């Protein structure tokens, strides 16, 4: 019985108790909260349901708790239900009910933890979207890891997810990139506000090798050639780096297509027609303050050029027109102002503003021996995705970026993540999985199997701790999806690995050399198999491998 199963049982029991006393059942919460007590001696789980509803039905909380305890204790799944304090209920599961969690995991396998509670969502998840003017820096790398994990978590919760990369190929930064490449090809210094780094020289040389005539063309044609080829080569490098990192996208959306297709003009006309765009001093302004923004925004400047927000508005419209009812933008730390303006754009176009969510990620700092690592071999000024992977590997890089909430800045100590010790979180979790695989191999050699195991034998305190931790996984996945916080999965994996290691140190899973195989060995092997499956499921959700040997 998982915490969710117990919550359902408590709710059903509460309905029966209130109904039998002709009390109002509508006051019961939609979901009963079930938590593990801080002191394990108080029981397996606790709930404050009696305190929540007693006053609403005109009853003393302890009296209501007493009625609930008596009714729950009559259920075969409950070993005991005791009242604490003003009306808390401390519940201890029967051994067989605890064992049901193990059986459930083994039956569900790779789908344990999944649900369909977000099946009503068609999500457009846009992340990374780095400009094609250089390699992906650490901020973009954080989104590459977190965004991919969030997509996995949302899909595990039943949502349809489209992973999208917004390709910024429209704007002055592309012109500066092209001029930087051209200067490098000519052997000239990097232009002011240009891009430097070894990668600029490499791309420039590749363009000249591919087009020997490039520098002999008319100046405008030369610049356009370096622009088009440079952007394409840089973007191919970005896609290759992301793929190696384990992050792929369903859609690569070109910003320039919004202007070339007329989508920007169409969106502007919609806003003019519905009165949400007004003219002032030759410019056209969005009435964004009417939709929660702190100021109205210029959409078309007085010289007739579109402001940057014009593309954002057209892009919002395009996402909704493709059938997405939730559009998640994962943006950098300097994009807080985008939250209100994107929601305002959606509302002004006639869409629900809650269909737009903006997640803001904070900075990432790389450290070695307590000192900042600032320089990249190829990029020249910033540390890149490739640098991080080269330093600590893909699994450690992804895990280090995912395990912390994105709304806080992150320091990554390279020495810690390079180490093969329990201090390294990803090593600790992966070692737990590898140890479990080793146990399974040894069990096969000894002829021990979990088939037909009597799971009611799992009564040791460490067994109970492990079973209860396993039972929490579905709720952790649900919370990670609902709150858009995949770091919860990584932290759970660490907790599960730690609980398993403590169980392993206290309980012999397989018979020793002088022992015969006993029913408890099969039961513990089943518990180990369930733990292995759950760890593998958690690692999959963060996009990290689950090694069988280490």
Curated annotation (Swiss-Prot):
Pfam families: Arg_tRNA_synt_N, DALR_1, tRNA-synt_1d. It is found in: Cytoplasm. The keyword Aminoacyl-tRNA synthetase applies. A motif ('HIGH' region) lies at residues 130-140. Transmembrane segments: none annotated. One of its GO terms (biological process) is arginyl-tRNA aminoacylation. One of its GO terms (cellular component) is cytoplasm. Keywords: Aminoacyl-tRNA synthetase, ATP-binding, Cytoplasm, Ligase, Nucleotide-binding, Protein biosynthesis. It catalyses: tRNA(Arg) + L-arginine + ATP = L-arginyl-tRNA(Arg) + AMP + diphosphate. PROSITE patterns: AA_TRNA_LIGASE_I. The keyword Isomerase does not apply. Belongs to the class-I aminoacyl-tRNA synthetase family. This is Arginine--tRNA ligase. It comes from Corynebacterium glutamicum (strain R). The lineage of its organism: Bacteria, Bacillati, Actinomycetota, Actinomycetes, Mycobacteriales. The gene is argS.
């Amino acid at each position: 019985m998982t915490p969710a199963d117990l919550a359902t049982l408590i709710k059903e029991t509460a309905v029966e108790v209130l109904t039998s006393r002709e009390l109002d059942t509508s006051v019961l919460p939609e979901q009963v909260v079930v938590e593990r007590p801080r002191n394990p001696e108080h029981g397996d789980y606790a709930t404050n349901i009696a305190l929540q509803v007693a006053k609403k039905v005109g009853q003393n909380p302890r009296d209501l708790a007493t009625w609930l305890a008596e009714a729950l204790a009559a259920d075969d799944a409950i070993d005991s239900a005791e009242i604490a304090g003003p009306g808390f209920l401390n519940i201890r599961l029967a051994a067989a009910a605890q064992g049901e969690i193990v059986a459930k995991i083994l039956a569900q396998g790779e789908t344990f933890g999944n649900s369909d509670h977000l099946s009503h969502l068609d999500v457009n998840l846009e992340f990374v979207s780095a400009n094609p003017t250089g390699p992906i820096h650490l901020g973009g790398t954080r989104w590459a890891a977190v965004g991919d994990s969030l997509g996995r978590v949302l899909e595990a919760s039943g949502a349809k997810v489209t992973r999208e990369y917004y390709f910024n190929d429209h704007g002055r930064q592309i012109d500066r990139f092209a001029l930087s490449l051209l200067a490098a090809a000519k052997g000239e210094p990097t232009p002011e506000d240009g891009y430097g780094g070894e990668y600029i020289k490499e791309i420039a040389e590749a363009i000249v090798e591919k087009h020997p005539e490039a520098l002999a063309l008319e100046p405008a044609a030369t610049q356009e050639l370096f622009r088009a080829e440079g952007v394409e080569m840089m973007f191919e490098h970005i896609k290759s780096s992301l793929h190696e990192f384990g992050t792929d996208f369903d859609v690569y959306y070109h910003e320039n297509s919004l202007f070339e297709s007329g989508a920007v003009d169409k969106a502007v006309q919609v806003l003019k027609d519905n009165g949400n765009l007004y003219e002032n001093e030759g410019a056209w302004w969005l009435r964004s303050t009417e939709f929660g923004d702190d100021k109205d925004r210029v959409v078309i400047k007085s010289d007739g050029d579109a402001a940057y927000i014009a593309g954002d508005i057209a892009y919002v419209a395009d996402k909704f027109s493709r059938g997405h009812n939730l559009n998640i933008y994962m943006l950098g730390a300097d994009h807080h102002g985008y939250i209100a303006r994107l929601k305002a754009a959606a509302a002004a176009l006639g869409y629900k503003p809650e269909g737009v969510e903006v997640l803001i990620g904070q900075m990432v700092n790389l450290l070695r021996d307590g000192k900042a690592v600032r320089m990249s071999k190829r990029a020249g000024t910033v540390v890149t995705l490739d640098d991080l992977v080269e330093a600590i590997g893909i699994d450690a890089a992804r895990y280090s970026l995912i395990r912390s909430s994105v709304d806080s800045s992150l320091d990554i100590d390279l020495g810690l993540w390079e180490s093969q010790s329990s201090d390294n979180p990803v090593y600790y979790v992966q070692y737990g999985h590898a140890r479990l695989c080793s146990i399974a191999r040894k069990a096969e050699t000894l002829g021990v199997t979990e088939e037909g195991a009597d799971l009611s034998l799992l009564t040791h305190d460490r067994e109970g701790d492990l079973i209860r931790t396993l039972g929490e996984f579905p709720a952790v996945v649900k919370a990670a999806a609902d709150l858009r916080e995949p770091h919860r999965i990584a932290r759970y994996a660490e907790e599960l690995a730690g609980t398993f290691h403590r169980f392993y140190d206290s309980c012999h899973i397989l018979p020793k050399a002088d022992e015969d195989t006993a029913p408890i060995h099969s039961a513990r092997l089943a518990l180990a198999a369930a733990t292995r499956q759950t760890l593998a499921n958690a690692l999959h959700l963060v996009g990290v491998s689950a090694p069988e040997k280490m």
